UniProtKB/Swiss-Prot annotation:
It comes from Geobacillus sp. (strain WCH70). This is Demethylmenaquinone methyltransferase. Methyltransferase required for the conversion of demethylmenaquinol (DMKH2) to menaquinol (MKH2). Keywords: Menaquinone biosynthesis, Methyltransferase, S-adenosyl-L-methionine, Transferase. PROSITE patterns: SAM_MT_UBIE, UBIE_1, UBIE_2. Its EC number is 2.1.1.163. It comes from the Bacteria. One of its GO terms (biological process) is menaquinone biosynthetic process. InterPro entries: MenG_heptapren, SAM-dependent_MTases_sf, UbiE/COQ5_MeTrFase, UbiE/COQ5_MeTrFase_CS. It catalyses: a 2-demethylmenaquinol + S-adenosyl-L-methionine = a menaquinol + S-adenosyl-L-homocysteine + H(+).
Length: 234
């Protein structure tokens, strides 16, 4: 039976939620933590501000934002997988973060008014949405003038030799890790497909410009396997 991209992605994350955090560490060799840490430094998040984490998943970046804005700030996490949000809710509860609210919703139609947030982030989620540009424009819409929108995502390595190794790893090794650690071979096969088909850093930077962002900053990580794109709204 035919499944749309959105339906397939929803099925994937509703199934792998229990193993998602562990598998992130396995797949990236824990580098994703360093990538996010560096991205947060570049964002220079200020106390008392308001942030939205789109495709928040199990809320790791949401929590990092909440700690950065402090008790006087507000952070919202948005995701379409209720199972992923349940894991996130437990983390928020354990940390007693009163300034965090997790919302079940769709990145293609963000349920907030225009010009609401100082920061809007999306971490390893943009490649899974049905239409990249629609989501970038939605993020642009809800960020305030002067605010920042940040995407941390897999990218396309350009280093000869390493690029071929990267594709081999994602195509053959990562699904095996999924089967071994999460009993989810098919689901992790999908994740490698989404990473393979995602735009490279220069193409995504142009998409940021097309969505209306200015003063775009791009930073590649670990030979280009991931990249941060940061755009400002005038």
């Amino acid at each position: 039976m035919y499944q749309s991209k959105e339906e397939r992605v929803h099925h994937v994350f509703e199934k792998i939620y229990k193993h998602y955090d562990r598998m992130n560490s396995v797949i990236s060799f824990r580098r994703h933590l360093k990538w996010r840490e560096d991205t947060m430094k570049r964002m220079n998040v200020q106390k008392g501000k308001k942030a939205l984490d789109v495709c928040c998943g199990t809320a790791d970046w949401t929590i990092a934002l909440a700690e950065a804005v402090g008790p006087s700030g507000e952070v919202y996490g948005l995701d379409f997988s209720k199972n992923m949000l349940q894991v996130g809710e437990q983390k928020v509860k354990e940390r007693q973060l009163a300034n965090v609210k997790l919302i079940h919703g769709n990145a293609m139609n963000i349920p907030f008014p225009d010009n609401t947030f100082d920061y809007v982030t999306i971490g390893f989620g943009l490649r899974n949405v049905p239409d990249y540009m629609t989501v970038l424009k939605e993020m642009y819409r809800v960020v305030k003038p002067g605010g920042k929108v940040v995407c941390l995502e897999t990218s396309q390595p350009t280093l000869i030799g390493f690029r071929q190794l990267y594709y081999f790893y994602f195509r053959f090794i990562m699904p095996l890790f999924g089967k071994l650690f999460a009993k989810s071979y098919e689901e992790y096969s999908w994740l490698q497909e989404s990473a393979r088909d995602f735009p490279g850093r220069d193409e995504l930077a142009q998409m940021f410009r097309d969505a209306g962002f200015v003063d775009i900053e791009v930073k590649s990580y670990t030979f280009g396997v991931a990249a941060m794109h940061l755009g400002h709204k005038r």
